[in-house]
Amino acid sequence: MLEMYVNCDGKKLRCGYTTGSCAAGAAKAATYMLYNEEILDLIKIDTPKGIELMLPIENIKKGDGFVECSIIKDGGDDPDITNGIEIWARAEVKKEGYTLKGGIGVGIVKSEGLYVEKGDYAINPVPRLMIEKEVKKVLPKDNGVLITVFVPKGEEIAKKTFNPRLNIVGGISILGTTGIVVPMSEEALQQSIKLEMNQKIKSGIKNFTFLFGNMGEDKAKEMGIDPKGFVIMSNYVGFALNCCRENNIKKILMVGHIGKMCKIAAGCFNTHSRVCGVRLEILALELALMGADTNFIEKIYREKTTEGAVKIIGKEYKDIYRRIGVKIMKKIKDFTYGEVNADIVLYSMEKGILWDSREVI
């Protein structure tokens, strides 16, 4: 177990190691045991982060001209679906040279725009380098080895990852840029946004719909919006908009719950609650600007949720949603220095669509 910790919102969280580190360790151990009689319990690898890992070997299978071994993915306190999955590597005797391929449970890339070529196994560049480097440390001179990375439960697990969205089929990806999993890593989430956008751009998609999560995705599908252009941006609105600028995307659609979208109206481009908590404040401010009674404004402000506030606002002040929507559109344009224009859809869970800028004549 990796005894490395980070502080997240005052909580001490344990770091872990990536699927890439597991694959590198399993491949190194299998190669060593292929050419040596010794049976290993642990294998040491270096990571790009500069941290040395001592990884426990879970299972070993030896046969004529091959060795297979596995390492359990330990993501620490990161809530990743691959945590606890068994990553296997098979080392086979080869006359000369080094070859790496994927096997069962490792996805195959079916689209361009990702870090791996279309048609190849989804073993990302850094893990590829890690595996090769570690294997060659123990590969005897003038001998060769064929390494196959496989994940028996990979196809099942992959259904709950980003891979179906990225058109990676048949299994999980072998990932990791540092070899270390940092719990709640913003970098990992942002990388998912960038990857998804790149893949869609390469496949010729021009109409992008940005969503905060699964609820927004369901609402957008319900509205009949083409899901091929969906991008889940989570709380990273600013990052997603910067990706648009980098890729010369001039026009987007953003669909979001009124609670999240209010934050953008206030100029917050990271909508996580610990970064930006203004929601009811924006509703109260707009009502004040519309001339609402002070007691009514206070009632809205005292509500626990924006859903509750929307129920109270009713039809009398329904123009509030247009006003907020227009502000969001302006904030997005200002944030991107005029390079990105956005259409906006605001919704609540109970009332449905509150305002859709595309319906404004």
Curated annotation (Swiss-Prot):
SUPFAM superfamilies: CbiD-like. It comes from the Bacteria. It is an enzyme of class 2 (transferase). Pathway: Cofactor biosynthesis; adenosylcobalamin biosynthesis; cob(II)yrinate a,c-diamide from sirohydrochlorin (anaerobic route): step 6/10. Keywords: Cobalamin biosynthesis, Methyltransferase, S-adenosyl-L-methionine, Transferase. It catalyses: Co-precorrin-5B + S-adenosyl-L-methionine = Co-precorrin-6A + S-adenosyl-L-homocysteine. Its EC number is 2.1.1.195. GO terms for molecular function: cobalt-precorrin-5B C1-methyltransferase activity. InterPro entries: CbiD (IPR002748), CbiD_sf (IPR036074). The keyword S-adenosyl-L-methionine applies. GO terms for biological process: anaerobic cobalamin biosynthetic process; methylation. HAMAP family: CbiD (MF_00787). PANTHER family: COBALT-PRECORRIN-5B C(1)-METHYLTRANSFERASE. Belongs to the CbiD family. This is Cobalt-precorrin-5B C(1)-methyltransferase. The lineage of its organism: Bacteria, Bacillati, Bacillota, Clostridia, Eubacteriales. The gene is cbiD.
